[in-house]
Regions:
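A detector of single, family-specific signature residues
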Residues: 1-224
């Protein structure tokens, strides 16, 4: 029953993340329509500078010389103050400001709900599965959020998976065996559990950037 609850929270988190990404894309489209090209210069549309600029615009502040004060100094140094001011210069109507405010509020609500689910998962795992939670976090690339997600999607009874290959196959990360008359038609991965697959892929990327571990060295040699 506890695993089922964790799974509900976990999949809700993934749905909320997708929703937030869609809203961020909508927000950027609204800015682009006003000829504001800030996304060309910030690392991503979820950055603090980007959010602060949107907040000021939704409050009715449209002067680029005022908006540029919300941009991180590193971005200004990299691209130049004049370039950033030009990117913040656009034509913004009252309707545009209202739409941005509404989208921003929707993102804030989704982020709050996401954090509530994360807190609930952490609370359950620390109470019921503290040993498994601690052990999972010793794996390179696996932090608290990933550990709770793995417990939710896999459970704690590993007797269901005889080998690591069985688990990889269940998550959909094992290439399919589509061969006929010694001709390989496809090596695409199977469908599997898309939530588990997403978590494992995120962990593998994190592990490839963890200094001193095998995955980091393997990833480096693969790119050479």
């Amino acid at each position: 029953e506890r695993i089922q609850q964790l799974r509900q929270y976990d999949r809700r988190i993934f749905d909320l993340e997708d929703e937030i990404n869609r809203k961020l894309s909508k927000l950027d489209a609204a800015l682009q329509r006003c000829n504001i090209r800030l996304s060309n210069y910030v690392s991503n549309t979820d950055s603090k500078s980007y959010k602060e600029v949107v907040a000021r615009i939704s409050e009715g502040i449209t002067d680029p010389k005022v908006l540029v004060e919300e941009i991180h100094g590193r971005i200004i140094n990299r691209h130049g103050r004049k370039t950033i001011i030009a990117a913040l210069t656009g034509v913004i109507t009252q309707a545009d400001s209202d739409m941005m405010r509404q989208i921003r509020e929707e993102i804030d609500i989704a982020e709050r709900h996401k954090q509530e689910c994360i807190d609930k998962m952490q609370e359950i795992c620390e109470k019921e599965y503290s040993d498994q939670l601690r052990n999972l976090q010793t794996i390179p690339g696996v932090k608290l959020r990933a550990a709770t997600s793995l417990i939710a999607e896999i459970g704690i009874d590993m007797s269901h998976f005889e080998t690591a290959n069985h688990l990889a196959s269940w998550s959909g990360l094992k290439p399919r065996n589509d061969e006929s008359n010694k001709v390989i038609k496809s090596k695409r991965i199977t469908h599997g559990n898309r939530y588990l697959r997403r978590t494992i892929i995120e962990c593998s990327w994190a592990a490839s950037r963890t200094q001193g571990c095998f995955f980091s060295r393997f990833s480096y040699h693969q790119t050479q």
